């Protein structure tokens, strides 16, 4: 949830040509933590217990809180300056009257659904398929490790190609990878394949999504507008976590949750294509 704040804060300080690279670096830094957290948690739970594990994570949170105090507002780049007369209400009306923004909000729901379904239910899913707990740890750690590469790569590609097309490709690839994962015989090799390939796509949706919002509306209300998009992501995260457990309790299997994840990927692939990425007239006049 907190990641939307530094991503938007960094995004305010870069032009459209460089923004996805900058936000890709921020997202990659988050992935370093995601790579280390499963390994660290698995180790500390086995050596010092859950009480000390929670205490260690409290220290990490305090570290993040302290460092956040040093994030000071700086002057935004002039080419991204929006009309000073625009207030919050006008910005919200403008955004929700833009079809592309509504589609972006809908599409990011899918990202939240998928990554939380994987992050929450892969451990149980792997045990159901006869593989040990360390297999899930390996998958989640590989996801974090390779997402560093994925977010940096998509950040660079976002400076060269259409961001909406990149998002459609990312979601389409997710559908293929999930299908291969659930329909293939369970093995450590397939688990490694899934961790690597899904990791490349894990948070790679963040830089182009943030970039589209800033590109269309400017950066004055970027944190708020991207925060709303991210709120949709978190609703999807709730749905992915809840439905995974619900279907398992109902049918004794995660299969239906995976089927929904694949269907949502196809939906997201299509829903991003009609987005008009061009800056609105107000932003063009101010550039």
Where are each of the predicted segments found?
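Cytoplasmic helix-loop-helix junction between adjacent transmembrane helices
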Residues: 1-28
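Helix-loop-helix hairpin linking two adjacent transmembrane segments in secondary transporters
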Residues: 25-76
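Extracytoplasmic gate region of multi-pass secondary transporters
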Residues: 98-154
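Helix-to-loop junctions at the C-terminal end of transmembrane segments
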Residues: 151-162, 249
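Glycine-rich segments within core transmembrane alpha-helices of 12-TM secondary carriers
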Residues: 19-38, 227-240
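Flexible cytoplasmic inter-helical loops of multi-pass small-molecule transporters
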Residues: 73-90, 281-287
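Paired intracellular helix-loop junctions of major facilitator superfamily
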Residues: 10-20, 213-222, 252
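C-terminal transmembrane helical hairpin of 12-TM major facilitator-type secondary transporters
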Residues: 143, 160-212
């Amino acid at each position: 949830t907190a990641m939307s704040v530094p991503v938007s804060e960094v995004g305010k300080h870069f032009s459209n040509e460089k923004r996805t690279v900058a936000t890709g670096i921020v997202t990659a830094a988050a992935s370093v933590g995601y790579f280390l957290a499963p390994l660290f948690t698995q180790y500390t739970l086995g050596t010092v217990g859950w009480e000390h594990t929670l205490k260690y994570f409290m220290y990490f949170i305090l570290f993040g809180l302290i460092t956040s105090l040093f994030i000071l507002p700086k002057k935004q780049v002039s080419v991204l300056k929006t009309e000073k007369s625009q207030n919050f209400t006008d910005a919200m009306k403008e955004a929700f009257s833009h079809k592309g923004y509504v589609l972006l909000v809908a599409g990011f729901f899918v990202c939240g659904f998928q990554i939380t379904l994987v992050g929450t239910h892969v451990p149980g899913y792997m045990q159901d398929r006869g593989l040990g707990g360390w297999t899930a740890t390996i998958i989640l750690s590989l996801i974090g490790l390779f997402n560093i590469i994925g977010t940096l790569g998509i950040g660079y590609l976002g400076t060269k190609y259409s961001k909406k097309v990149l998002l459609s490709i990312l979601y389409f690839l997710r559908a293929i990878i999930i299908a291969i994962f659930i329909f293939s015989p369970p093995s450590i090799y397939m688990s490694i394949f899934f961790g690597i390939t899904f990791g490349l796509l894990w948070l790679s949706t963040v830089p182009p999504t943030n970039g589209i919002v800033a590109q269309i509306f400017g950066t004055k209300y970027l944190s708020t507008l991207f925060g709303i998009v991210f709120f949709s992501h978190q609703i999807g995260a709730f749905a992915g976590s809840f439905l995974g457990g619900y279907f398992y309790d109902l049918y004794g299997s995660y299969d239906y949750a995976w089927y929904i994840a694949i269907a949502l990927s196809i939906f997201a692939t299509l829903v991003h294509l009609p987005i008009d990425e061009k800056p609105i007239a107000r932003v063009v006049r101010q550039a």
